[in-house]
């Protein structure tokens, strides 16, 4: 989902991948667009296929050299057998049966033409499906995410891609280039392999025991210096996860390196690293490696959907992480220019939607036009109970023709409920949008904005809004967005924010904004996991399990 950009040493966000367009290769942090490879694979190689008279073309065979499978057939079945390293299911492509059939064909008696034709068709169908799945994912995101339709530069023709790769005799390379060409994707594949190795680890043979002072229906708490019956199990689990060194002696109580290991674990799971094991930390410690494997697989699937950073700048908000990152490409390298905490929509009823749009303007000292749903459910009832709230919060009524009325009456409240008037909040220190909002027009009317409620950024879980996204560092974000407009210095930005008069500024260059959802990421060699706050991983998991595999038949 943009997600997914990184610097050599900076964080890699689990949220984007190349889709359809020129491959993006990053070696040691250097970004290169392999458009020449893309053009060759999709154009020139097809011309070669059609006119160069190779034995492959002449006989109409892709995988066989006469009666025996060629080397690329072996490469293909190896790729299919290794599909699990991408979080895919090898048997979706009939990998075992095809692998055995190719082995038998290579070692046994010569096959009849009809058998060869069936194997050719089955292997071609399997490889086309594999390339399509590894390139753009198995599920259309629009089937499970309202209005999410990420932009893709061009369609992916798996059949043409495969044929061109075979003619060029570079099938393994072409298959690798079909996957998202970003560091995070490869880092997550490594994490996937690591967590698969832990699936049968004895550290999870039974759950950790209840915490000290726990009561029926109430969780306890483990703090430094306390005794705990599960101390050895806890240490074993932290060693298995890499948060505790294996040679550390087990203390008699919860203290020392064990507390430090729990803090490292908490840091990797989006929790306050205070070393105190409460209900939430215990719940994360109980999650099995098998569940983490599935979480990584789902994140890899999301990476295959998400749009590539095609321009010089991009903003990505990762909802489960509650973090915004602003990226810039300079000298062929991707740099994280800004990273800040955000507040997103409440999981229960006002979730922030996923989408991909362009930021086009900024509003300084904005009015807050109260959405009708909030006016009906919250503001009008509050004003009936507490009329003084109207003046204290700087509210006013606005008619359809733009007339403004700052007098609170029962008739005006009735008119708001009837949809005849609306409520807005004037610019000022109490304005719910703060001093600035960042606009990227979209059907859900979602935007980024400042907030006077800065204390919310201190929470681990930050889903408090009505859907829009509150940013922790609005001035820094404005400086990034206005980078192409040097006349907008930090001083000028601050003046516009504090003037108290609403003003709109059009951007000279739109900035892509991606609101993404990734519950796993890798940064600085560590794998991080975040709570599935909106249940979207569960939704994706169910959709993938319902998806009929339809493996290609070889009979």
Task: Explain the meaning of each model-derived region.
Residues 9, 35-38, 54:
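Serine residues within intrinsically disordered or low-complexity segments
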Residues 32-44:
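Bacterial N-terminal signal peptides that target proteins for export
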Residues 20-32:
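Short, Lys/Arg-enriched N-terminal segments with co-localized hydrophobic residues
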Residues 58, 125-128, 148, 166-555:
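Well-ordered beta-sheet/strand-loop patches within structured domains
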Residues 58-163:
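Cationic-aromatic interfacial patches
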Residues 43-53:
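Bacterial N-terminal signal peptides
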């Amino acid at each position: 989902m943009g997600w997914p950009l990184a610097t050599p040493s900076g964080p890699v966000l689990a949220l984007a991948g190349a889709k359809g367009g020129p491959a993006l290769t990053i070696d040691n942090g250097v970004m290169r667009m392999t458009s020449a490879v893309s053009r060759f694979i999709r154009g020139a190689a097809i011309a070669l296929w059609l006119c160069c008279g190779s034995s492959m073309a002449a006989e109409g065979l892709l995988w066989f050299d006469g009666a025996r499978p060629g080397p690329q057939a072996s490469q293909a079945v190896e790729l299919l057998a290794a599909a699990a390293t991408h979080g895919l299911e090898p048997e979706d492509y009939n990998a075992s049966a095809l692998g055995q059939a190719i082995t038998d064909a290579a070692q046994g008696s010569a096959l009849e033409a009809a058998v060869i034709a069936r194997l050719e068709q089955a292997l071609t169908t399997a490889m086309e499906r594999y390339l399509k799945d590894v390139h753009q994912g198995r599920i259309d995101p629009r089937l499970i995410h309202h209005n999410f339709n990420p932009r893709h530069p061009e369609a992916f023709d798996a059949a043409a891609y495969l044929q061109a790769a075979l003619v060029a005799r570079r099938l393994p390379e072409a298959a690798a280039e079909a996957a998202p060409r970003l560091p995070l994707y490869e880092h997550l594949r490594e994490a996937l392999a690591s967590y698969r190795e832990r699936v049968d680890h004895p550290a999870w043979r039974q759950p950790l025991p209840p915490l000290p002072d726990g009561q029926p229906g109430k969780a306890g708490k483990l703090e430094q210096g306390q005794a705990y019956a599960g101390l050895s199990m806890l240490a074993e689990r932290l060693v298995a996860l890499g948060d505790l060194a294996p040679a550390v002696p087990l203390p008699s109580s919860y203290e020392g390196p064990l507390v430090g290991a729990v803090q490292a674990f908490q840091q990797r799971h989006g929790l306050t690293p205070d070393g105190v094991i409460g209900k939430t930390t215990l719940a994360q410690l109980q999650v099995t490696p098998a569940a983490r494997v599935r979480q990584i697989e789902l994140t890899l699937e999301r990476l295959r959907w998400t749009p590539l950073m095609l321009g010089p700048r991009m903003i990505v908000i990762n909802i489960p992480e509650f973090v915004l990152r602003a990226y810039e490409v300079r000298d062929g390298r991707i740099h994280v220019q800004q990273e800040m905490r955000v507040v997103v929509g409440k999981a229960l009823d006002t979730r922030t939607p996923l989408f991909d749009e362009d930021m086009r303007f900024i509003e300084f000292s904005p009015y807050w036009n109260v959405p009708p749903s909030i006016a009906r459910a919250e503001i009008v009832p509050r004003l009936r109970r507490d009329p003084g709230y109207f003046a204290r919060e700087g509210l006013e009524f606005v008619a359809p023709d733009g007339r403004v009325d700052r007098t609170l009456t029962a008739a005006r409240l009735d008119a708001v409920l009837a949809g005849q008037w609306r409520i807005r909040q004037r610019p000022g220190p109490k304005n719910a949008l703060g001093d600035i909002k960042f606009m990227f027009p979209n059907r859900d009317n979602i935007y980024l904005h400042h907030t006077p409620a800065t204390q919310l950024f201190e929470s681990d879980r930050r889903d408090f809004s009505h859907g829009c996204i509150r940013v922790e560092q609005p001035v820094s974000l404005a400086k990034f967005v206005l980078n192409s407009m040097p006349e907008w210095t930090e001083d000028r930005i601050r003046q516009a924010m504090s003037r108290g008069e609403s003003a709109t500024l059009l951007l000279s260059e739109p900035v892509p904004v991606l609101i993404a959802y990734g519950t796993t990421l890798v940064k600085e060699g560590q794998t991080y996991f975040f709570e599935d706050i909106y249940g979207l991983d569960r939704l994706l998991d169910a959709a993938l399990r319902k998806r009929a595999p339809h493996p290609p038949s070889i009979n």
